[in-house]
From Swiss-Prot:
GO terms for cellular component: cytoplasm. The active site is at D119. It comes from Chlamydia pneumoniae (Chlamydophila pneumoniae). InterPro entries: Enolpyruvate_Tfrase_dom (IPR001986), Enolpyruvate_Tfrase_sf (IPR036968), MurA_subfamily (IPR050068), RNA3'P_cycl/enolpyr_Trfase_a/b (IPR013792), UDP_GlcNAc_COvinyl_MurA (IPR005750). UDP-N-acetyl-alpha-D-glucosamine binds at R94, D309, V331. Signal peptide: none annotated. It is an enzyme of class 2 (transferase). CDD domains: UdpNAET. This is UDP-N-acetylglucosamine 1-carboxyvinyltransferase. GO terms for biological process: cell division; cell wall organization; peptidoglycan biosynthetic process; regulation of cell shape; UDP-N-acetylgalactosamine biosynthetic process. Cell wall formation. Adds enolpyruvyl to UDP-N-acetylglucosamine. Keywords: Cell cycle, Cell division, Cell shape, Cell wall biogenesis/degradation, Cytoplasm, Peptidoglycan synthesis, Transferase.
């Protein structure tokens, strides 16, 4: 296995380029399966989740050509050769469940997908997916290893109202509605930028699809789609991540391709605690405008609110901001466990089951912590950390970059590879001191100060 040793290095300075959005690229690859024509995607990020989705599409009959230097990928699926997703894709991420919507139009006789995985940040149940698909004429059954869906009478358009604006359920229903007979109106949809990117892709390919400001998507089923050439939008989570790393280190980093319109709630919160930024046509420069001051309430929400994926790295900023701040996580019920790692480094954090904000969320009666108070500013100390999920991983790297007392040992760095293109190289280019090592599991029981590390990065 690979681990990272990250040293406190002082200020980060320089420039990095934001890659294409993970949460758009993976979904557009699945959407390409709606068409039997060639689809070209540009600005494709070279990350683990995209590679995995490419292999998933290939297993179903897709022909894929991916030039990683130019970031251009061509995918062509003239016919679906397999309607049972191989079990090797079980529990690795949440992409396979979207194949129900994408494939049923071309394979109404039935599709089988294995159980889904992804970050360990809560139950993330599939009820919204299944209930919506059933309203389109889909019959669904399940066993311990996966889900079987079929549409024996074909997909039929319908009026669907989602109980919650779930991103995944919105995507699945859009994909299914493309091949459904008649009109489908989906209410209370998620309207994240990646959803709109999916809509643009489908419209270019020939779909009759529109959106409205009242969280409505309207689709007339058109059957098969044509060829399409589409450039993936930049990753707003990666852009914010490097912006936060710059601010917490006291440095100055220009994040090329960062888009202000994708970052509005993040930039507002960043400025409120003392972070600075300068917006230009080609990107955003991030820096620390004044000593960081807390006393804020950070509440995650669906778009256009503060994204849950920004919350974890932002907690590191709050640990270095003078005063007490509140985090209220309303999107995923189990996304604050990473704070134990920051506590181990010296951060002062308290977890609460109550909703610590002006409004109660859907987890108000849940028996689990989904709010936290962070008291800053406190020095952080190098520690041995195990990454629990992708965004917590970047938070741990940020914390290690400002920690005192040597290098932090960080396990499960493969989770960072899922969502950040060349994260080690990009951080090194800004002055970060990071080494990647191969290590046997039993060696990790040794104190980080006495580890016999074998460098695999040279």
């Amino acid at each position: 296995m690979q681990i990272a040793q990250v040293f406190g290095c002082g200020r980060l300075n320089g420039e990095v380029k934001v890659s294409g959005a993970k949460n758009a690229a993976t979904k557009l690859l699945v959407a390409s399966l709606l068409s039997d024509q060639k689809c070209t995607l540009r600005n494709v990020p070279d990350i683990g989740d995209v590679s995995l989705t490419v292999e998933l599409c290939k297993s179903l009959g897709a022909h894929v050509s991916w030039d990683k230097e130019t970031e251009v990928l061509e995918i062509y699926t003239p016919e679906i050769q397999c309607t049972r997703v191989p079990p090797t894709f079980s529990n690795v991420n949440r992409i396979p469940i979207l194949l129900l919507g994408a494939l049923l139009g071309r394979c109404p006789e039935g599709v089988y997908v294995p159980t889904v995985g992804g970050d360990a940040i809560g139950e993330r149940t599939l009820n919204f997916h299944f209930e919506g698909l059933k309203q389109l004429g889909v019959q669904i059954s399940s066993d311990s290893s996966g889900y079987y869906a079929k549409a024996p009478r074909g997909l039929k358009g319908n009026y669907i109202h989602l109980p919650y604006p779930s991103v995944g359920a919105t995507e699945n229903l859009i994909l299914a509605a493309i091949h459904a007979k008649g009109r489908t109106v989906i209410k209370n949809v998620a309207l994240e930028a990646e959803i709109l990117d999916l809509v643009l892709f489908l419209q270019k390919a020939g779909a009759d699809i529109t959106t409205d400001n009242d969280r409505t998507i309207d689709i007339f089923g058109t059957g098969g789609l044509g060829s399409v050439d589409h450039t993936i939008l930049p990753d707003k989570i990666e852009a914010a991540s490097f912006g936060m790393a710059a601010v917490v280190s006291g440095g100055r980093v220009f994040v090329r391709n960062a888009k202000q319109e994708l970052l509005i709630p993040f930039l507002k919160m960043l400025r409120s605690i003392g972070g600075g930024f300068l917006v230009s046509e080609s990107g955003i420069e991030f820096f620390q405008e004044r000593p960081l001051v807390g006393g804020v309430v950070l509440e995650t929400d669906v778009h256009p609110g503060f994204l849950t994926d920004w919350q974890q790295p932002f907690a590191v900023l709050l640990s270095q901001a003078q005063g007490s701040s509140v985090i209220h996580e309303t999107v995923h019920e189990n996304r604050l466990g990473y704070l134990h790692g920051l506590q181990h480094m010296g951060a002062e954090c308290q977890l609460f089951h109550q909703c610590l904000s002006t409004k109660a969320c859907r987890y108000a009666i849940g028996n689990f912590p989904h709010s936290a108070v962070i008291h800053g500013a406190t020095p952080l100390w190098a520690s041995h950390l195990v990454i629990p999920d992708l965004r917590a991983g970047f938070a741990y790297v940020m914390a290690a970059l400002i920690a005192e007392g040597g290098g932090s040992i960080i396990e499960n760095t493969h989770l960072l590879d899922r969502g950040y293109t060349n994260w080690v190289g990009k951080l090194r280019s800004l002055g970060a001191k990071i080494q990647i090592f191969d290590m046997e599991q039993e060696e990790l029981t040794t104190s980080p100060k006495s580890l016999a590390l074998r460098d695999a990065s040279l």
